[in-house]
Regions:
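Cysteine-centric segments in proteins
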Residues: 1-83
Length: 83
């Protein structure tokens, strides 16, 4: 892969439904078993992953002080773009 390509990494996500019906991810488990806490969700929108392919709800999250995108696909699976 070149430096600009990415691939999908499907992850397990701990999420909550708020009382007003929003779905918010709280943490995810990376492929090596490491759990990453999501400090903040800064944006939620329907979008395509231009790096890895796929479409769904894109959550822009702050994880370990860095911005990351977590996608919830229409098939009810979560993925992260591997860097």
């Amino acid at each position: 892969m070149s430096g600009t390509e990415s691939s999908k990494v499907y992850v397990n996500v701990m999420a909550e439904f708020t009382k007003d019906g929003r779905l918010l991810p709280r943490s995810f488990i990376w492929k090596d078993g490491q759990v990453y806490e999501i400090q903040r969700v800064t944006d939620v929108r329907r979008a395509a992953s231009l790096k890895a392919g796929g479409v769904g709800i894109r959550y822009t999250c702050i994880v370990n002080g860095r911005e990351s995108h977590l996608f919830y696909e229409d098939n009810n699976m979560w993925f992260v773009e591997e860097r």
